[in-house]
């Protein structure tokens, strides 16, 4: 199947309900209401730092797409809104542009339309292991230059690769290759999951190679479900059945934040099933330093209401902070909270600090 059709399939399926699976467990986190906050809403300050750079909000636009005409149009709109609001933006996997120079423009529009905000380049883990160190360094340089990236993300998508008809489930040697990426990039390296979460054990290993971890937890967009839908369309009954069995595989985002924070003292980005500013505020209270959203912004972009979506998330974060008496993001991180039985049991069994 042509890669451009696959990319467009991902766009439409990711924006649909068929891709939304499970719960990220933010309903297991209750931020305690402060009836006497002793601040005005106008005093709430949501500015923060993204890997050292000051940004206007504690969230950014997560990795989504690139490589087709539709993807290029979406990336242009996302970049414009990121620039307008002063928030970071990731791009989708750039492998397609490295192999097909004629589609580089679908990523370069991000550099053009968001010149001043932090931009995050993106390469997939399976491709790292198959490249020589020299070729990998070349790819990293090109990916960074393509969007004038401030940081580069390496996405871990083992679960997707085993279901995807064109999948490449090759992960031997990836850890050492991330070291090559870090040396070649000369800028922050983010290691991220894409919907199945990161455990304490993996987080502790990433101390050596990552400047940040993006947990990419379970409970939102499921690439297993997306690939299962594609398999059904192509007539692959076996892959469809396997996807159905494994679509609930993963670490819920709320639990994955606790897992990552327990194994890694560096910068943590929350993603996966964050559907509101309140979800994002809960992620920050759990220990994340920043959060990203993808599906809500993709859907809003396709429906022509992207600015409203960003404004709504900003309002929700501010209100959550006001109602917990948190003037700053740092205050929010220490806001009193109560955990539901599933998350509390997970924390206790896994001996997590959260």
From Swiss-Prot:
Keywords: Cytoplasm, Flavoprotein, FMN, Isomerase, Isoprene biosynthesis, Magnesium, Metal-binding, NADP. One of its GO terms (molecular function) is NADPH binding. Its EC number is 5.3.3.2. It catalyses: isopentenyl diphosphate = dimethylallyl diphosphate. It comes from the Archaea. It is an enzyme of class 5 (isomerase). GO terms for biological process: isoprenoid biosynthetic process. GO terms for cellular component: cytoplasm. Its cofactor is FMN; NADPH; Mg(2+). Mg(2+) binds at residue 161. FMN binds at residues 63-65, 93, 122, 192, 221, 273-275, 294-295. It is found in: Cytoplasm. HAMAP family: Idi_2. NCBIfam families: IPP_isom_2. Belongs to the IPP isomerase type 2 family. Homooctamer. Dimer of tetramers. Involved in the biosynthesis of isoprenoids. Catalyzes the 1,3-allylic rearrangement of the homoallylic substrate isopentenyl (IPP) to its allylic isomer, dimethylallyl diphosphate (DMAPP). PANTHER family: ISOPENTENYL-DIPHOSPHATE DELTA-ISOMERASE. This is Isopentenyl-diphosphate delta-isomerase.
